[in-house]
């Protein structure tokens, strides 16, 4: 299927590593020129050079702190200057979830909570607020928010709250921006294989004495496909949602964790 993405222009926050980088790569392979944005300029420069060499597309790394409105305005303006416009925004800049033991109620300080929400929820809102008028002026756009399956699970109070908030933000934006040609969706990855996974597995092997294969099997114990989803497979879904082919999907949530056992979502 031709996703009709050739020549589109995208901004991917959290794009220097992990799922964000995988999304930037897949978009570029589909013919999209991409700005990847994150905090560390050196990591951005290295990732941009590697992705440009692999895909043959224009890949630019721009530093951003999505907690700061001035920085957000600058990265959107920089994207327009670098690419000549902006058609697609992927919000993937967030504190990683699922790696450490989530804090219990007594351990959740105001600062911990608000810092996490400021990065993911307010950060996504700031980016959309700045990018949407550019897309509306062109009559077309896509905004994809990367959230996570903590939205449907207990066990991480902050993780669940922030991800539910991202889903609510997504639906509100979709209703407001849909008539202007801008579709907004939210994607919920589960535990996903990224470049960090081998290190996580090695640490658990050292702590438990289990074989690496058994550690990974346990990590995917509640995944119905029987293994972890790879970040490239998440990127495939996002590339479709970023395309004109996805016009029938707006304001909805797409889970891409390989299937959660037992739960029924409708």
Name each region found by the language model.
Residues 178, 183, 249-251:
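Short, small/polar-rich loop/turn modules that mediate ligand/substrate recognition or access, typified
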Residues 95-96, 110, 142-166, 170-179, ...:
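Catalytic loop of short-chain dehydrogenase/reductase
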Residues 73, 94-114, 137, 158:
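Conserved mid-core segment of classical short-chain dehydrogenase/reductases
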Residues 119-137, 174-175, 243:
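Amphipathic alpha-helical dimer-interface segment in Rossmann-like NAD(P)H-dependent oxidoreductases
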Residues 18-19, 102, 239, 250-266:
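Short C-terminal tail/terminal secondary-structure segment
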Residues 41, 63-75, 110:
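The beta1-alpha1 cofactor-binding region of Rossmann-like NAD(H)/NADP(H)-dependent oxidoreductases
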Residues 3-35:
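Canonical Rossmann dinucleotide-binding motif of NAD(H)/NADP(H)-dependent dehydrogenases/reductases
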Residues 106-126, 140, 144, 166:
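Catalytic Tyr-X3-Lys loop
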């Amino acid at each position: 299927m031709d996703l009709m993405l050739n020549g589109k222009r995208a901004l991917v926050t959290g794009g220097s590593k992990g799922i964000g980088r995988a999304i930037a790569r897949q978009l570029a392979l589909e013919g999209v020129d991409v700005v990847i944005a994150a905090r560390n300029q050196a990591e951005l420069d290295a990732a941009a050079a590697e992705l440009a060499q692999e895909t043959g597309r224009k890949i630019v790394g721009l530093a951003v702190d999505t907690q700061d409105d001035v920085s957000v305005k600058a990265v959107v303006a920089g994207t327009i200057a670098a690419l000549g416009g902006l058609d697609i925004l992927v919000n993937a800049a967030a504190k990683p979830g699922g790696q450490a033991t989530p804090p219990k109620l007594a351990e959740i300080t105001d600062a911990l909570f608000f810092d996490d929400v400021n990065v993911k929820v307010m950060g996504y809102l700031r980016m959309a607020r700045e990018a949407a008028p550019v897309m509306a002026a062109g009559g077309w756009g896509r905004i994809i928010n990367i959230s996570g399956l903590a939205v449907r699970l207990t066990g991480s109070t902050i993780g669940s709250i922030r991800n539910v908030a991202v889903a609510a933000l997504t639906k509100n934006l979709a209703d407001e921006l849909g008539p202007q040609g801008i579709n907004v969706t939210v994607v919920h990855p589960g535990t996903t294989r990224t470049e960090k996974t081998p290190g996580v597995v090695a640490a658990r092997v050292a702590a438990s004495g289990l074989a690496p294969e058994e550690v990974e099997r346990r990590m995917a114990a509640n995944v119905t496909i029987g293994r972890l989803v790879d970040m490239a497979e998440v990127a495939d879904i996002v590339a479709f949602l970023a395309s004109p082919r996805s016009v029938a999907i707006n304001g909805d949530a797409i889970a891409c964790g390989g299937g959660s056992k037992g739960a029924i979502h409708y």
